[in-house]
Amino acid sequence: MRIEVWPDYGPQNSQPIFDAFIKSLRNAGDEVLINKKTKADVAVIWSVLWLGRMQQYRKIWDEYRNAGKPVIVLEVGGLRRNESFKIGINGINRRADFANQTFDDRRWPLFKHTLKPWNTTGDIIVICGQHDASEQWKGLPRMEQWIEEQITEIRKHTTRP
């Protein structure tokens, strides 16, 4: 398989991850083309946040997705940030295919993380958002509007700040 990999536009912390990914592709016998536009079978980019250095990825994303070709997206992990990493097909988080239809339970202990019970008490409520320049936010309202909507909904259920 011919695979375009684009480390040049990734953030500073992405280079070792790209290097390891490129090595694994080559070890599998794939033809890897680095930072070269070649109309390959697959493209590999870092994140779907179209800001700063990474805004160059949007052209690659659009070209491959519009052609019906897959884009592999490398990204920092949600747990142990900058120690764990995600690899998704055609997106990240809920929009990605992680090819994990079958998996075992051997990876979870590697995180050395114990889940704590959900906290239903406390003095404040924290609303977490997403950067609205991300492909993940495509088609959704501006972040400011979304946060206002969440506050309105939460106030129907509690008086906590």
Regions found by a protein language model. Give the residues of each.
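A short, gly/pro- and small-residue-rich
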Residues: G52-L79, E148-E149
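N-terminal pre-catalytic "stem/leader" segment of glycosyltransferase-like enzymes
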Residues: M1-L51, A133-S134, E144-Q145, T159
